[in-house]
Structures are given as C-alpha cells and as structure tokens.
Amino acid sequence: MKKSKWILLTGLVINSFFAQSQSVDKIKFFAEEGIIEMTLTTDIPKMQKEKGEEVFQPATASLKFPDNTVIAEPITVAPRGHFRREYCDVPPILIAFKSATSPRLSPLGKLKLVIGCGSRGNDEQVLIKEYLIYKMYNLLDEKSFRVRLLKVNFVDTRNKVKPYSQYAFLIEDDKDMAARNNCIRKPGAKYQTESTDRDQMTKVGVFEYMISNGDWSVPANHNTKLIFDKNNESALPFVVPYDFDHSGFVNASYATPNELLGTESVTERVYRGFPREEDELQVIMDFYRSKKEAITSLINNCTYLLPKIKKEAIDYLNDFYKTISDKKVVRRIFKDNARTK
C-alpha cells in the first residue's frame, strides 16, 4: 500500500514538473483570448536612445497567463520602427524570445510588440483601437495577423525610469501566419496591386476604406505582406494588411493624412484600391454587411474601451455601412472614381 502511494505521489510530481516546464504553443498563444500580464525588465533609457536597426539588448520577460501560469526567462529586445520611435515615450519593440536560456518561450521566436505612445488614458485607448482592427480583420479572413493583448509592466534595470504599466499587443510572426494558411513568404518579392489575388485585394481595399487607412502600398511592401500558396506555384499572391495606427478608426493624435489623397483628416475616407465591376461590388458589400453584427459585438464586448470611445468607434463604422447601402454611391466610390494607376 505504501509502495502504491509512493508511486502515485512520484507520478504526480513528475507530471507537475513536465506541466510547469512545457514550452509555449505559438499557435495556441495567438488563438486564445485572455490578457497576459508581462513584466519586461531591461535598460529602458538605452533602448530609447538606440537609433540602429535590430540592435538587441538583454532583458527579462515574466509572463503571467490567464490560468496563473508564470514563465520568467531571459530574452533580448530591440527598438524598431521609424515614426513612433521618434514620437513616442517608448518605441515599438522587437522581442527575441528564442535562445538557449529561454526554452519555454523560445517557440515564439521574434515578435513585434506594439506599444501605445505613452501610458496616458487616451494613448491606451488608441492602442486598444488598433488592436481591435486586427481582431476585426480576423473576423473577415484567416489570412490575417493574429494578435495577443498584454498588460506590460516596464522595469528599468538601472532604476533611471520609474516602473510603469500600459497595454500592448504582440503580433503573430509573418512566417507563422503564412504557414497557418498553407502559404509561404517570399521576402523581397514585389508585385503591382492588380497582380495579386483579385478577390483578396478587393477585400483588403474595402477594409482599408472602412477603417480609413491610407498608409499602405502593395508595390512598396508598405504595411502589407504577400503570402504565396505553397501548393500552387502559379497562384497569384495574397495581400495581408497590417499596421493601422494612422487610420481614421484609430484617429491617433500624431496621424496625418497621406498627401497623395488630398484629404484634411485621417478620418476622411478615400478608396485606394482599383476599380471593381458591379457584380464584384455586390458580392463584397454583401460580405461586409454579413459581418456587421460580429464586428459591432467585438467592439461592444471589449472591456478595455471606454463607453464614449466605443460609441465613437461604432458610429464611425455605421457611417461606412450607410455608404455601402447605396448602390449608386458604391459605384461612384469603388468603380467610377477609383484610381487607375
């Protein structure tokens, strides 16, 4: 009897050890919804001053998951981006989780951490709205970047900066996003907008119009990624949009309109896609109408947005839905007055 109890106890201890030492599943990491609390410890002033690309420095990340599991391991971080690096209190960060000393976090690889421009209330609301745009596009297409919301506690190793906390989110790696859709990435590949998958590009163009984002370009690979069907070499690439902080839906204080559009505010919508035929427009507008309830519910159910901001966001989208309810207006915007080059 004592031997049986000892075997049972030993088994429980072993099972507990393996449970505690399991690596993070990178697919589940982005598929699950609960917020993660992360404490990021590094030399913050050094990171703020760094001007180079992918210049990594030592850091420690402690991640507390919704089930109260905690993983704390050494990582490295680097400032990234251009505009927000100059404008914001803390630049966007590239986190390298993979290393020999971080076996549990290593499967996450390198991920972009998107941070608000500051820890003030409005900055965080702006951050949450951009996060919601990614979630909105997830509702429309599997060929989209998944994101995971975090509450990040920043700790400076030299105590030059007082500890502070703010919302942030991690963006799925582009190669992982492609693989999830049976596709591959071809870094450096450049295509003209109309040389990509037409149906996908139609969906992307209307989405960018819906959120009023003029800060993208397919030929320049600016805020879009191309993914290629790995089982069909002759298939045209799919366009996947990202980086929406200059959109009218977000309406960040630092966002300015694309000069090419001739608008006075980022909230003024301009369709940047190419003309579509009326039968194509009927199909895509029906598709967007079918997603209205899910998109509205997503915003209404977001507990991190203030009621006033929720209302503004929904009103802004309702204006889009009002526009696409009129066939004549749709034809004028998405066909007659659309760009041709």
Model regions and ranges:
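Bacterial Sec-dependent N-terminal signal peptides
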Residues: 1-23
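Phosphate/dinucleotide-binding and metal-coordinating scaffold of catalytic cores
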Residues: 21-341
